[in-house]
Each structure stands twice: as C-alpha cells, then as structure tokens.
C-alpha cells in the first residue's frame, strides 16, 4: 500500500470511528470468504458496517476519537464492526459468533467506555432503539385509550339501564 493510500485509509477510518456509537472488535482468522460476505450482509441489514484494515493504520485512525480504547484489542487478524445504534453491531456480532466458532469477539467500545466480551454480550441482549421507541409509543398511547374507555363507560351503563328498564316494561 502506498503512503498516499495509507493516509486516505486512515482518514476514512478516522471519520467512521469519530461518528460511530459503538465498535466491536473480533478475530476472524479461519473464516471463509462466503462467511465474511454473510457477516457484511447481516451487518448492513442491521444498519452496521464491518471494517478490516491493518491494525497499525486502525490504531492511528483511532487517535482523537471516543473509541480509542479498542486500540489494545487490535492484535492479529481483527475485524471492527461499527454502528450508530448501540445495539446493532453487538447483536449481529454475537449471533454470528454463535454460528461461527472461528469468529471470536475480543471486546469493544461504546463511546469512551471500553467493553469486555461480557459487556458486548449484555449490550447485544438489549432491545434496539426502534424496539424501545415502539414500546414507548405503546406506553404513551395506553393511558389515552384507557381514558377514552372510561369516558364512554358511564354513557354505556346508562344505555344498558334504560334498555333493561324498557325490557322489564315490555315483560309486564
């Protein structure tokens, strides 16, 4: 790789690291090309991305970013999964690691907080931002629906009492 190409690669990686919400580092030694393509496809569907670069260039790109703490994890054949959603990259990485034993998660970073493997697994078990938003909307709508039911209930009761009284009058 020429010096200019290295500089451009570092700049691109730096932009990715600067804007990412979470980064997950894993070893990928022994994975086939098809498996790596599958990982990239799954990450893309989840709104995340996968980067494979020289560790030395990645360490340079990490400088001045929140995720600089993952630098010590960059040893050997590593892949870095990033996403803005704090759950997307960890969730896909954990699922992929379960299916492929050669994909070993080393740790990660969420903002300036360095994560170990257990923390990445815990993060992956959380619901995504979209799921949380859906639940929040449901919780907000539930009281309004209940209030509408309560407001209509007295009128319905009065109607049933009148209907019952009318039924008695016809029976007599």
Swiss-Prot record:
It comes from Bradyrhizobium sp. (strain ORS 278). PROSITE patterns: RIBOSOMAL_L10 (PS01109). Keywords: Ribonucleoprotein, Ribosomal protein, RNA-binding, rRNA-binding. Belongs to the universal ribosomal protein uL10 family. GO terms for molecular function: large ribosomal subunit rRNA binding; structural constituent of ribosome. One of its GO terms (cellular component) is large ribosomal subunit. The gene is rplJ. Coiled coil: none annotated. It comes from the Bacteria. It holds the Pfam family Ribosomal_L10. One of its GO terms (biological process) is translation. Forms part of the ribosomal stalk, playing a central role in the interaction of the ribosome with GTP-bound translation factors. Part of the ribosomal stalk of the 50S ribosomal subunit. The N-terminus interacts with L11 and the large rRNA to form the base of the stalk. The C-terminus forms an elongated spine to which L12 dimers bind in a sequential fashion forming a multimeric L10(L12)X complex. The keyword Ribosomal protein applies. HAMAP family: Ribosomal_uL10 (MF_00362). This is Large ribosomal subunit protein uL10.
């Amino acid at each position: 790789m020429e010096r200019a190409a290295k500089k451009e690669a570092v700049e691109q990686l730096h932009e990715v690291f600067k804007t990412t919400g979470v980064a997950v580092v894993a070893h990928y030694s022994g994975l086939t090309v098809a498996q790596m393509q599958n990982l990239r496809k799954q990450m893309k569907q989840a709104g995340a991305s996968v980067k494979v670069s020289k560790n030395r260039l990645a360490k340079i790109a990490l400088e001045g970013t929140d995720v600089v703490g993952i630098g010590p994890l960059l040893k050997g054949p590593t892949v870095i999964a990033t996403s803005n959603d704090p759950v997307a990259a960890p969730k896909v990485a954990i699922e992929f690691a379960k299916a492929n034993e050669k994909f070993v998660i080393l740790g990660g970073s969420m903002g300036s907080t360095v994560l170990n493997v257990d923390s990445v697994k815990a993060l992956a078990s959380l619901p995504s931002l979209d799921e949380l938003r859906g639940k929040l909307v449901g919780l907000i709508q539930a009281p309004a629906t209940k209030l509408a039911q309560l407001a209509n209930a007295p009128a319905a009761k009065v109607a049933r009492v009148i209907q019952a009284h009318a039924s008695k009058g016809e029976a007599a």
